Curated annotation (Swiss-Prot):
Interacts with IFT46. PROSITE patterns: WD_REPEATS_1 (PS00678), WD_REPEATS_2 (PS50082), WD_REPEATS_REGION (PS50294). Its main location: cytoplasm. This is Dynein assembly factor with WD repeat domains 1. It is found in: Cytoplasm, Cytoskeleton, Flagellum basal body; Cytoplasm, Cytoskeleton, Flagellum axoneme. SUPFAM superfamilies: TolB, C-terminal domain (SSF50960), WD40 repeat-like (SSF50978). WD repeats lie at residues 90-129, 132-174, 175-214, 217-256, 259-298, 301-340, 343-384, 386-415. InterPro entries: G-protein_beta_WD-40_rep, WD40/YVTN_repeat-like_dom_sf, WD40_repeat_CS, WD40_repeat_dom_sf, WD40_rpt. Keywords: Cell projection, Cilium, Cytoplasm, Cytoskeleton, Flagellum, Repeat, WD repeat. Signal peptide: none annotated. Required for axonemal dynein assembly and ciliary motility in ciliated organs, including Kupffer's vesicle, during embryogenesis. Facilitates the onset of robust cilia motility during development. The gene is DAW1.
Amino acid sequence: MKLKSFLLRYYPPGIMLEYEKHGELKTKSIDLLDLGPSTDVSALVEEIQKAEPLITASRTEQVKLLIQRLQEKLGQHSNHTFYLFKVLKAHILPLTNVALNKSGSCFITGSYDRTCKLWDTASGEELNTLEGHRNVVYAIAFNNPYGDKTATGSFDKTCKLWSVETGKCYHTFRGHTAEIVCLSFNPQSTLVATGSMDTTAKLWNIQNGEEVCTLRGHSAEIISLSFNTSGDRIITGSFDHTVVVWDADTGGKVNILIGHCAEISSALFNWDCSLILTGSMDKTCMLWDATNGKCVATLTGHDDEILDSCFDYTGKLIATASADGTARIFSAATRKCIAKLEGHEGEISKISFNPQGNRLLTGSSDKTARIWDAQTGQCLQVLEGHTDEIFSCTFNYKGNIVITGSKDNTCRIWR
């Protein structure tokens, strides 16, 4: 085995090794999820070298420099104050969703007007209009980290795959018998998964546009789906109160997560694929062992439905957003609530961490988005200006740009 090169992954911190084995180029990753600004770099490199024979003594200084770069990134933009950069009158009818590509250079909006629009983040200029759906475009996603394709799911029961650069439609995926309300690319960007009100999810081949398999088993609408980091598992959350874990290669059921007593609102894996987090209208979130499907904790405290939930990039923190107007931060290790985020005057429908994991972004029906300190729960900033409910808000990969989407038909870029 011969080491060819290093690649850095900033969030969550990690080093990818490209190496040659029997004439074939392979990659492996060293996850540094515990890396912090005060980590002893020399001791860490020593530890890595004990476990990884590819990193020989001659590479020691190089690896130290790489880890120092990762440390610097963790501290960047941590005290960033956001200012309104642009208001985009994005569509003539209400927006449904907003998604950013990985670099944050462009983003996409979906709308009730049956179109999607691609926007340049730096200028706020429209790049392309994606036309062809015959009903509301509800679900949208980029094939991050590549970002050269986008998928759109519609109430017209189809999903379309588009070129980001040209706006050309590559494929129209047909087969669902009801509205498509969620979708996701696998990390390898070879498959698109779609979830529908017809109670099924489907996997589609990006290259040839063919259906790979149908995931059947839910008895009610599927409203949430996501792949794990390695792309070999997919989870679907349904109005039937259950979450199902599927084998992404065969389409077979791996586990059924039964425990919630109302509709599921969100379901996702943590970074290392060991845990699954589910949020429900029953006012709780549950943590599950991703291998055996057993519930390991129930996160309680909210007085109303959980509308969104998420892990930070490392999987150490969990955030929950509720119709009770508050958000909460939990430790994934102790399962204890470490902060309660109070200040919104309406339900919170969206929540996400910045890539560095020290800030939280919430969007609410009170027409504002807020930035919070993820350790203390203190509100650091209120993003005001929308004239109707905010249903979508997201950080870019660097954590220095925020996009908000509202029922007032506008999108705002904050930087």
